[in-house]
Amino acid sequence: MKILVIGGMHGNEMLGIDLVKSLQENPLENIDSVLANEEAIKINKRFVEQDLNRSFPGVKSSDIYEQQRPIELLKMCKEYDIVLDFHNTFCPDNDCTFVGEGANEELLGASWLLGLPRVIVADYDCINKYALNCVSIEISVQSRLNDVKIWRQKLQMLAEKEIADCQATSEVEKFRFVYRMTLEDKTRLNLDQANLIAFQQIDQSLAEKMGVKNPAYPIFINDKFTPYNYGGLLNKIDK
């Protein structure tokens, strides 16, 4: 299959950046790569003026780079069977993937083949909402998967398959992103004392106080990459 690898959607998340540089220096067959936000990469910041991955589908008439760039990226995505968009998190045990609502079912199979059986459906203005062939890959900086060599091997394996080989499996856990916990929530509910652990069910009363259906599962708690919010909450999607 034909694959596009995106790195540097956020300019300070190094796995994707280093992976793209590796692929550009030593290409793999049927795999192209692109750095999404080169301006943010230059200054080692998440973004310059606004978060690129909250700016899709973009604004053609804008003079802001991070509003124009989504249009170019979405056009590129149409040329590939699967797009893999790489991200990092400081939170341990948060390795997972994101897809858009209505995404190709093959993306679930691809996630499993890549060793990432937790898949989250997101409907905010990220690339996945508009490129339904895109899997965003989140890897903890502490994870053994935070390694360019490992991903080159995984990419080569995936590129040798046909898209039809990426069949969904019952081993995939599917979640929906339903709530973004704010810093106000952190203070109001004393969340630092709640012992929230990624993908482990939170207390029912706590979920109710945030207006979220139970059972709810936290993710990206107190991530240094996103200090302006506290984390997210997920609901599990029945198989």
Task: Report each predicted region and the residues it spans.
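Structured catalytic-domain cores with a bias toward divalent-metal coordination
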Residues: 1-239
